[in-house]
Amino acid sequence: MIKVSGIFSIFYSLLLLSRIYVIAGVYKLPMDPSLIQVGYVGVLIMVAIVQIKENNYKIEKHLKTMDAASLLLIGYWAIFGFVFVNPPMEQYTKAIVLRQGLFLAAVIVTALFAYRNNYFVEVISASFWTIAVVLLFQFITNINDVTQIDISSILNVSSRSRVNFGLGHYNYLGMLCSCEIILGIWIRKFKNKNKLSLFIIALASIMLLGSASRNAIFGLIVFSLIEFYFSLEKYVFRKVYKFIIQISIVGIVLIMALFGDSRVSLDGLLLDSNRMTLFSVALPTFFKSNRTWIGLGLASGEIYGQNLTPYKTYWLDNGYLYTLITSGYIGITIYVALIILFLISYWKLKKQNNSMGILAIATFSMYLFSALFETTLFNGGVLLNYLLLPVFLILLDYRSETEDETLEDLNEVKK
């Protein structure tokens, strides 16, 4: 008989598999992918109902941090999807409302179900091995792309040799690979260290270099630097040396945040970067709109980028400014509060379980860094959120009994 954990892993993997190809723009099955999301949510809800009847499902009597975060996400969606709708933007807002609604349903139900069944291991494992299957398949079926990889051109300001292994945009492949590497680190550090997972990490690294996605590569570097920064206490250093190293790491991260994804030299950054239009066009348009508190209206980055709205903005390639411009001061305040909630919870987790807390902070820092260059911030149209947001939500309330508890220990505590 298949266990509930097995059913969850299978359906969660199917959801991720469909999302990977849909968001990549290469989904070819005749079935409407939205039905897969609806079916997935329906299955988990039905299983939860059965568990409640059998008294196998934990019902919390008090509001958890995860519940508060979920309410903020839902509140943002409801406020700007149904209340503060800009009439000229209504058709675009409706599309966002549907996409974001399905996304939130899938992610929040996943997090709640996994947390209350103690399936954190299953979430990490299903994500890692689903991506592994996709990358392996795409690598084999597009093997000729390997010959076009040119590592030396990754930082070339004029041209880069880039391949996508059949997965849409190069940056999409880069994001998928960087996420796979981080998930692999979680698995190898806390669950197992088999050679197959190491092989998958190596494969993802090769494909990441092929994508030549600077955002993804620098995001991984930020992850590594943040993890090292908080791991310094494990090593014997004089305080002055430790302080110098920590200041250096902070400086490197700040420099990368400012210049990491630029397409040009540092000297010509503000003059030539495509993202300069955020400050020269998009923000002035926003401030002149008389909608600074509630924003210009929800619409995808592509709609704004092609100036299909009544407002001239060009591409809003920054998750924070995108949130400000589309949902105003109220919207950005909600998301900033959500970010602070995550950071405070992970800091508390670090004090209780150093290894888990450090990985949580490092992974979330990479996520925040990536939002500097793309509209990834809690965006249902971005695969990164399907892969990491359930993990982020579960970790909000994760508390270990001892410092040495690992993901393997979590797997032992089953109902």
Where do the language-model regions lie?
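N-terminal signal-anchor transmembrane segment
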Residues: 1-55, 76-84, 367-371
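Hydrophobic transmembrane alpha-helices and their immediate junctions
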Residues: 64-65, 194, 221-225, 229-233, ...
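Aromatic-anchored transmembrane helix interface
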Residues: 67-78, 89-113, 122-128, 132-135
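Membrane-interfacial entry segments at the cytosolic side of transmembrane helices
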Residues: 119-126, 193-197, 234-247
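Alpha-helical transmembrane segments of multi-pass inner-membrane proteins
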Residues: 122-149, 166-230
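A membrane-periplasm/extracellular boundary helix in multi-pass inner-membrane enzymes
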Residues: 140-142, 228-270, 283-288
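Transmembrane alpha-helices of multi-pass inner-membrane enzymes
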Residues: 182, 361-370, 376-415
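Long extracytoplasmic/lumenal interhelical loops at the membrane interface
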Residues: 266-327
